[in-house]
Amino acid sequence: MNILIVCNHFYPHNRIATFRLNAFARYFREAGHSVTVITEGDRDETAMWNGCEVHYVKDPVITSSKQESLLQRRKKWAFRRILSALQFRLFLDYKRIWQFKACKKARKLAKSRQFDVVLSSYGHLSSHRIAYRLHRKMPFYWIADMRDETSGRTGQRLVLVLK
């Protein structure tokens, strides 16, 4: 089975979201499936990781490593950070511009191989938007992983509002 994973966080980043998606990819591969990953990277490149083909797509606005270095140097108002914040306020997604580049890459890959399953993971909304755009054009099973999106006390707040 051909599986495509679309996410913002993947190896070599050191985050909780990365560990979860690395595990998905590794265990799918160990089960005998062909795994392709589209994720955010510092440059546009393709690499192999544990038998999985990983396509890194650079965000033209600001890469994750650049943003982390700005935060560590306590630079709050760098032009790229302002542009990233503006994207969020306009589209509710920091990675809206990255989404278009990644979607183009996903379409190109989908034309060359037929994906049976696409797994998109919430880190930014853009990964789900990419999977949705692909799903409108091509038949496959779509798994939208929301992670801990609604693990908070949302129900209790709703009760308080209704009282």
Locate predicted features.
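Nucleotide-sugar donor phosphate/pyrophosphate-binding loop at the beta->alpha transition
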Residues: 138-143, 151-163
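A short acidic, amphipathic alpha-helical/loop segment
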Residues: 130-134
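A conserved catalytic-core segment of Leloir-type glycosyltransferases
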Residues: 37-101, 105, 109
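Histidine-centered beta-alpha loop that forms part of the nucleotide-sugar donor binding/catalytic region
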Residues: 8-10, 122-123, 146-149
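N-terminal subdomain of nucleotide-sugar transferases
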Residues: 1-62
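Short N-terminal targeting/anchoring amphipathic segment
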Residues: 106-127, 140-143
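Soluble or luminal CAZymes and related metallo-dependent hydrolases
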Residues: 16, 94-101, 126, 162
